Amino acid sequence: MESYFPPGATANHSSIRTSSPASTPLSPPTQRSNALSNRLTSVLSASYADSDIRDALETLSLRGVHNTAETRRQLRLDVQKEVVECNAEIVRDFGKVAEHIVRAKQDTAPVIEEASALMNQKKESETKQQLLDAFVKHFVVSDDDLLVLTSAEEPIDDRFFDVLDRVKQVHHDCEVLLGGENQRLGLELMEKSSRNLNSAYQKLFRWIQKEFKSLNLEDPRISSSIRRALRVLAERPSLFHSCLDFFADARDYALSDAFHYALTDAVSGSGGDRNVKPIEFSAHDPLRYVGDMLAWVHSTTVSEREALEALFVADGEEIAKGIQAGLSSEPWSRIDEGEEVSFDGQKALSDLVNRDLVGVSRALRQRVELVIQGHDEPVTCYKVVHLLSFYRATFSRLLGTKSNLADMMQTLENFTFARFESIMREQVNVLSNDHAALTPPDDLSAPEFFLDALEELTSLMKTHDASLGAEDAESESTADNKFTPVLRVAFDPFLQLAKSSAAELPDATARAIYTTNVLLTARSTISAFPFASATHLNPISTALSSLRMELLEIQHRYLLDASGLGVLLAALESFSPSPTTSKPESEGKDGHAPPQADRQPTDIAEIADLPAFQQEALIAVSQQLDDFLPSALMDATDNLKHLQSASFVQSVTEEAVEAFCRDFEFVEGMIIGADEARGRVHIKRTEDGSDAGVEDDVVTESGKVPDGDEQESGLRRLFPRTTGEIRVLLS
């Protein structure tokens, strides 16, 4: 038992009581008075009214303790003694309790062991019961559920799919049972679940086939049950593809019947909407007829794809996942065993749409070929070619480049273009045997058949230009573009016929003018279209350049003949530059002369002895030149009056006039040179005394009389025209 007073409390009180007498006698009286006051204050301020002090005082009171000095000194020891005695008695009592417990344990040990064994057995039994219940609940399917799964009388509803999911899970979990030592249970359960699954898939397959017979794809509210059934059936690829084959055959028949009804308004089985006019009765030309059929096929293809997307792809990749799982579970259905099998949903969808439209494609091809074979209008055929090309690109984007519809559009496009080529060849053959059509017109303009061909070509080029996209414009401007085959059959043969018909004309001038008119007309037609100019403009321009040089020679020769200058040039031919002198062919034809200093031979004085330079002949040429010059430019232009390009005539005439002026300058220079040479000869003869002098005046080496007058003499007097005058009159 603990002490009722804090340890050292008594000593503290006694020290307090004895502290004052211990003060030194030398301490001041004031300090002793303050210490006593502080002590009294401390004692008086202590409170003895709290509960702990009251309880302690009450306990002392009950023990009968007297407040004496001896008692206060022994109180602590007495209390500790009592505590020790109490503790010893408690220990003795607990020892008796321990002995009692040991005896009780010895007596109950067999009972406890038996009870423990029973409890363990109970726990094992409960665990086995739980395992059995869980096994039965998970691996055993009730007869009612199996009836829903396999019976043909039971409907395909949510319960069917729930039971099917459970049986599939049981079949999958049987793999765990096969991992143990005893595999009999797992094998039996797997065999049973496999039979149930096969029966369920067969039931689902027959139900989907039945639903497909009455399925209306035009109805946007397609049953969710059939979509779910297709997703589930996809886990059996063989059944799923058989189902798709059945569906494709049914849709092929339905769409073929619908196409026939759209064409003829005679659907098999029942009447249709009489407000819709059949295509064969509303389309009055081949282009409209083919366009309406293609538009119907395109609209049907889009609708069919959208409906099949809603049926097969609306729920994401569930069908693809199911088929992938089925391919993994049916390895014997793989074609390429060494390759990883993957399912492309979009490709499968496009293939299904292609199969649905097999009958429609066959009917469309037959009708288009019949229409094209019976039509002889090339422009319409070419428009059909572009229409087919447009739908080929459309179906390629919709179903893929290797789809049946895209291939059929390509085949029809090639067939129609071959028909177009055949029509153009027939026209060329007919024209080749029509002599009247090939005869050039009197005005030497382009022939009528060529103008008709260019008119058709313009329509073809406009059709092609309208069909070009912005991304194709640049590529179409290169050589050998898509329009080049058209030009080869619709332009080149007619141009060749027009050029060959020039042989009917009597003279070279008419032939050159006629051929030039043909080429100018052709150039003006194709130059407006870059895709045609890219391949045919350069050859035409080259041919026109050659014809221009020929017309320039003709015009130049006309000026020389009409003016009489040609006679003088012919006489001076021996005074022209030597054959070794290099000059362009055109200058050789035009008779252009190099500068006078390079053309004066040593015997230039003999020019006056030539017949063409005798007085009468030279006066006649000079008079002919004077008569020609006032109307020379108009006459020269009139010489090419049948040429249909005024600018072409002007440029050729101007160059011919320039060549004529150079020829005149050459003749003038030779005449002046001859006079000067004769003057030098006369002077030499005078100095030698062999002659009395000149005819009228003495001519110096400079060709002038001694008195300084500018009087001309000799040939120059007979041929007074100057190059400057000629240029002014012909400007």
UniProtKB/Swiss-Prot annotation:
Its main location: Golgi. InterPro entries: COG6 (IPR010490), COG6_C (IPR048369), COG6_N (IPR048368). One of its GO terms (biological process) is intra-Golgi vesicle-mediated transport. GO terms for cellular component: Golgi membrane; Golgi transport complex. It is a peripheral membrane protein. Pfam families: COG6_C, COG6_N. Residues 689-699 have a biased composition (Acidic residues). Keywords: Golgi apparatus, Membrane, Protein transport, Transport. It is found in: Golgi apparatus membrane. Residues 1-36, 578-599, 686-714 are annotated as: Disordered. PANTHER family: COMPONENT OF OLIGOMERIC GOLGI COMPLEX 6, CONSERVED OLIGOMERIC GOLGI COMPLEX SUBUNIT 6. Acts as a component of the peripheral membrane COG complex that is involved in intra-Golgi protein trafficking. COG is located at the cis-Golgi, and regulates tethering of retrograde intra-Golgi vesicles and possibly a number of other membrane trafficking events. Belongs to the COG6 family. This is Conserved oligomeric Golgi complex subunit 6. It comes from Neosartorya fischeri (strain ATCC 1020 / DSM 3700 / CBS 544.65 / FGSC A1164 / JCM 1740 / NRRL 181 / WB 181).
